[in-house]
């Protein structure tokens, strides 16, 4: 007969495995084998600053049946047609698709683009996704890769705005400008001309979770530039993501604002993992950092635009319950005034950093 101590240990071990096997977002919907019959439940599962994002919940379903693209006059059944409608829509796909957009795809507010149940690829050498002055957008279950620059040209922005000339774009996978309430979850992003995700120009209420970022140098930019004060109100949650392999820097790189980086798993980076300028507040909690082998790359953090260490001494960059391997280390600074950054609807449980590899094991598109 097993000893009471052994039994107690096994019960304790099972409790640890059970609590850490799935993160709270995945536990909310993936445990239901019939999730396809209740797709909109996903909108109840976000955590962090983007937890109020409803996307297309409560609207009609719109099914993408064609990979064709007409930037000015999209036809029904195409992704651009659904994404530019004024009405609330939950967009799904009838089959596996490889979509090469001819111009950036402007996503109107109150939309969910839900790739679950199909193998959906965007980019493929064309421009990708763009959001401006919209709210309540969910992007889930998409492979976004090979996004390229675009030229000046006419694009249908939305039904109400109509067709307008759009400046050339840099080749980001996902661009958000002055966006509120957006949730980017369970996507696989790689190999684009510029960044994978840009959150700028007063965007706030954003959660970026369960994504896989790989084979890309400049991953995630939060904040427009060092002179854009409106980004001081920016609040972004970066949680349960897998960074790497072959992710170079900006995971994320923040200007101004408040960024909570929680339970992410970091493979060795090329330049740095987390960076910033213009006094952002960066709270790193329960992440797992594995440093590169080169001794001069061991530091997780990079403060940009500081003439000296003392110039950044008051920036609030804190590491709590992070796990470090292969010599990785986080340089903390500043004093945080308030530890309760979330309201009751936004808050979620953050595990210790040693659990991050398990919590991110399903990051990216889920089959």
Curated annotation (Swiss-Prot):
Pfam families: Pectate_lyase_4. Binds 1 Ca(2+) ion. SMART domains: Amb_all (SM00656). Keywords: Allergen, Calcium, Disulfide bond, Glycoprotein, Lyase, Metal-binding, Signal. Glycans are attached at residues 148, 178. Belongs to the polysaccharide lyase 1 family. Amb a subfamily. Ca(2+) binds at residues 170, 194, 198. Has pectate lyase activity. It comes from Juniperus virginiana. Pathway: Glycan metabolism; pectin degradation; 2-dehydro-3-deoxy-D-gluconate from pectin: step 2/5. The active site is at 250. InterPro entries: AmbAllergen (IPR018082), Pec_lyase (IPR002022), Pectin_lyas_fold (IPR012334), Pectin_lyase_fold/virulence (IPR011050), PEL (IPR045032). This is Pectate lyase 1. GO terms for molecular function: metal ion binding; pectate lyase activity. It catalyses: Eliminative cleavage of (1->4)-alpha-D-galacturonan to give oligosaccharides with 4-deoxy-alpha-D-galact-4-enuronosyl groups at their non-reducing ends. One of its GO terms (biological process) is pectin catabolic process. Its EC number is 4.2.2.2. Residues 1-21 form the signal peptide. Disulfide bonds join 28-45, 128-147, 306-312. Its cofactor is Ca(2+). PANTHER family: PECTATE LYASE 16-RELATED, PECTATE LYASE 18-RELATED. It comes from the Eukaryota.
């Amino acid at each position: 007969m097993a000893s009471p101590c052994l039994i107690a240990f096994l019960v304790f071990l099972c409790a640890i495995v059970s609590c850490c096997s799935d993160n709270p977002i995945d536990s909310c919907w993936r445990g239901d084998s019939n999730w396809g019959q209740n797709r909109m439940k996903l909108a109840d599962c976000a955590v962090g600053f983007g937890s109020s994002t409803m996307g297309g919940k409560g609207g009609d379903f719109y099914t993408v049946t064609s990979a064709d693209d007409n930037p000015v006059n999209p036809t029904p059944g195409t992704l651009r047609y659904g994404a530019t409608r004024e009405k609330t829509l939950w967009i799904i796909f009838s089959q596996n698709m490889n979509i090469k957009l001819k111009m950036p795809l402007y996503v109107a507010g109150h939309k969910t683009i839900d790739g679950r149940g199909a193998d959906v690829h965007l980019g493929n050498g064309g421009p990708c996704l763009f959001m401006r002055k919209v709210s309540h957008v969910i992007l889930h279950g998409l492979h976004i890769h090979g996004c390229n620059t675009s030229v000046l040209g006419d694009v249908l922005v939305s039904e109400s705005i109509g067709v307008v000339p759009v400046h050339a774009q840099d080749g980001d996978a996902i661009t958000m400008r002055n966006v509120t309430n957006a949730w980017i979850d369970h996507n696989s992003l790689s190999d684009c001309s510029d960044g994978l995700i840009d959150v700028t120009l007063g965007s706030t209420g954003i959660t970026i979770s369960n994504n896989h970022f790989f084979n890309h140098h400049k991953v995630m930019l939060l904040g427009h530039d060092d002179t854009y004060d409106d980004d001081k109100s920016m609040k972004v949650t970066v949680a349960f993501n897998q960074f790497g392999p072959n992710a170079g820097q900006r995971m994320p790189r923040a200007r101004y604002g408040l960024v909570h980086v929680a339970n992410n798993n970091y493979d060795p980076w090329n330049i740095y993992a987390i960076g910033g300028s213009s006094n952002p507040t960066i709270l790193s909690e329960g992440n797992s950092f594995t440093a590169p082998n080169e001794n001069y790359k061991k530091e997780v953090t990079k403060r940009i635009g500081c003439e000296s260490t003392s110039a950044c001494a008051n920036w609030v960059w804190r590491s709590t319950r992070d796990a470090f391997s292969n010599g990785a280390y986080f340089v903390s600074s500043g004093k945080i005034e308030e530890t309760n950054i979330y309201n009751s609807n936004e808050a979620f449980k953050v595990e210790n950093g040693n659990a991050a590899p398990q919590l991110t094991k399903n990051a990216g598109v889920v089959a």
